[in-house]
Amino acid sequence: RDKYLPEILSKKEIENMIISSKNFSHRTMIMLMYSSGMRASEIINLQWRDIDFERNTIHIKHAKGGKDRIVMLSPKVKKALRMIDINRDGLVFKTNRGEKYSLRSIQLIVKKAATKAGIKKRVKPHSLRHSFATHLLENGVDVRYIRDLLGHANLQTTMIYTKVSKKDLSKIKSPLDII
């Protein structure tokens, strides 16, 4: 089957999604998915004890493929997380009824934020993960580091992101023009 590539969002589109999301928890989820490359399933299962506020890292346990991995905790997300829950016990994100979010509810939160931001693309939670990887790549981060942040076992999986990276080819100089 063809590999489905989620839509890549521009930095401005992501910023607009964050701004348009009025629910603080929902906004923090969107920020966290984009800033860390976490999957929706990892967001809904995230526990307070997995966040290291000192080292600015998040320990993702039993991710896809059964592997643990460490992702970065952005200072902006850290600040938002500190405002969410004073108890800091159990799940980080809970519904108004104190229950665990479903994957469907995360999809709807992301879709609603994209719609409110005026984005016409088909935006899914995975679009934020894909945009995270693509933007890192465009900023010159080595694809091997991106592989580790995404938790891919195989570099080939991460290499899919290089196909959609919109690095400006006109700015790349031929080696001949450098000598």
Map each language-model feature to its residues.
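Conserved catalytic core of the tyrosine transesterase superfamily
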Residues: 1-179
